[in-house]
Regions:
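Amphipathic alpha-helical binding modules
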Residues: 62-105
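Alpha-helix capping and helix-coil boundary motifs
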Residues: 1-2, 9, 28, 45-52, ...
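Short terminal alpha-helical segments
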Residues: 1-37, 91-105
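Amphipathic alpha-helical interaction modules
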Residues: 22-71
């Protein structure tokens, strides 16, 4: 069973991912952004932890579709150093989500 601490870590990671997708997705990832926001709203809801996990597991796979999902998302910036930093931060947040969700998927 997922702990409340893990829910909060997921929430923080999804918030960071949502900010990056919103800022650097240039409108092409609106569907993914809606799923991320749904994840956050689910975590914040009054539903039972079991119901939350059911939703989080179901929608997790939609985030990493073969085309147009978070696995395809790359942040571009003309400044190579900044681009590398942003993509590293993005990848760290994706790994953070995976490290929590992998035991439940």
């Amino acid at each position: 069973m997922i702990r409340n601490e893990e829910f909060m870590q997921l929430r923080e990671a999804y918030m960071e991912l949502g900010k990056m997708v919103h800022k650097y997705g240039y409108g092409q990832y609106n569907g993914i952004l809606r799923i991320v926001m749904g994840q956050i709203n689910c975590i914040d809801s009054d539903e039972s932890n079991d119901e939350k996990m059911k939703y989080l597991i179901e929608s997790y796979s939609k985030l990493f579709t073969s085309r147009g999902g978070l696995s395809d998302f790359i942040i571009y910036d003309a400044d190579i150093q900044l681009r590398n930093q942003l993509n590293e931060k993005y990848n760290d947040e994706v790994k953070r989500v995976w490290n929590i969700m992998k035991d439940y998927i």
